[in-house]
């Protein structure tokens, strides 16, 4: 496995800062936690975002579990089908009630679609819920509309154990959705290694990664 470290894109940092300004600060969240009825369920996410300054790139091979998922249109598919085909795929993990990390990552996917332009139909974007018990297909569909998801960006839910199995397979399982961190995965085609980006990568960085990987392979 090889890794490089690069600074978080300024636009993403500003977006994250803006989201944080709309929510209680980490210190304030801790104060609220001790007050009846005033705990902030997203406090740990706020703390995570406040410490994210760099995105780290690594490459890895992941063994995909044989699990089923449910797409935002209600269609049952396997994980292999969701990630299959010979097109490049970009994957992340989100949940629809997240107010910190997920909106930033989903906005990045929105911008990535624009960055890809007429090549957008050749890249599959996949977002898998880490809160499948709450994220029904209808909720995912509404979330997709909120972020102007194109036809090649699909969101998936399913049984809790299947979501956890996928997260574990990608070494992204944190045990609690409130402890999740931003991580994005890119694969040019089946059989090739995944590029893993921990932290906030910009749409421009993801598009550049896709172009570089396709050129190499």
Question: Residue spans of the language-model regions?
Answer:
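Extracytoplasmic
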Residues: 59-64, 84-88, 120-125, 135, ...
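Hydrophobic beta-strand positions
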Residues: 68-72, 186-187
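Short active-site neighborhood of thiol/selenol oxidoreductases, capturing the structured segment around
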Residues: 79-103, 109
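Thiol-based oxidoreductase modules, predominantly thioredoxin-like and allied folds used
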Residues: 122-135, 151-163
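Short, internal strand/loop/helix patches
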Residues: 142-181
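Thiol-/selenol-based redox modules, centered on thioredoxin-like
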Residues: 179-217
């Amino acid at each position: 496995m090889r890794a490089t470290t690069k600074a978080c894109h300024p636009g993403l940092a500003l977006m994250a800062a803006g989201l944080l300004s709309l929510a209680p600060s980490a210190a304030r969240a801790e104060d609220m936690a001790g007050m009846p009825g005033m705990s902030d369920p997203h406090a740990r996410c706020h703390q995570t975002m406040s410490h994210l300054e760099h995105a780290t790139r690594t490459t890895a091979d992941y063994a995909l579990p044989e699990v089923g998922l449910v797409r935002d249109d209600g269609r049952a598919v396997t994980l292999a089908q969701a990630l299959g085909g010979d097109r490049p795929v970009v994957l992340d993990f989100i949940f629809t009630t997240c107010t910190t990390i997920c909106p930033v990552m989903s906005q990045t996917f929105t911008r990535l679609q624009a960055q890809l332009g007429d090549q957008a139909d050749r890249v599959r974007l996949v977002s898998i819920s880490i809160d499948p018990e709450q994220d029904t297909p209808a909720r995912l569909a509404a979330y997709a509309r909120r972020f102007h998801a194109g036809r090649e960006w699909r969101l998936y839910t399913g049984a809790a154990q299947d979501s956890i199995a996928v997260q574990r397979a990608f070494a992204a399982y944190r045990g609690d959705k409130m402890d999740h961190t931003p991580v994005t995965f890119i694969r040019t085609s089946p059989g090739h290694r995944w590029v893993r980006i921990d932290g906030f990568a910009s749409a421009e960085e993801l598009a550049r990664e896709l172009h570089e990987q396709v050129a190499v392979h």
